[in-house]
Amino acid sequence: MSLHKSRYTLKILILFVSFLSSQNAAAHGGVAFEDDLCVINIDFLQAHFTVFQPETRESDEFCEDIPDVARSVFVMEYLHSLLPEMAIDFRIIRDINEVGRYATLDDVLAIDDLEAATVYYEPPRIEPGGFYTASYEFDAEGTYIGVVTADHPTEDRYY
């Protein structure tokens, strides 16, 4: 469950916040693709990241602030043809160092006990259908950092 520290690594950090108050909800709107905050770049790879809370928000889509402490379904739609061949893992950690929305890989690596900060971990898996999904039920409000790691299918590289 370690982040790959010894090799050339690039990780994409997705920050999201879970609040009980719906005043902080930021639903995904119909923005242009190039302005879409839900599009994440993993080096040269792109994916569209969306969070749903079906029990409390029906079909509303979120990509940063998650309004409710409830079950959250994370969907990453692959926008690059290489991603369906890559082993992808997903981790949610508490923002124990309080770095907030601008967390970096260095901030994550600075956590002394990543295992203790991790509230959810989905081991690497290949999703050839073009979508990666995971579900986690938050039990406390707070700031959480999502970390996605992609393993190149033929080269010794991680993204």
Please provide the spans of the model-predicted regions:
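N-terminal signal peptide c-region/cleavage motif recognized by signal peptidases
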Residues: 22-24
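Sec-dependent N-terminal signal peptides of Gram-positive bacterial secreted proteins and lipoproteins
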Residues: 12-19
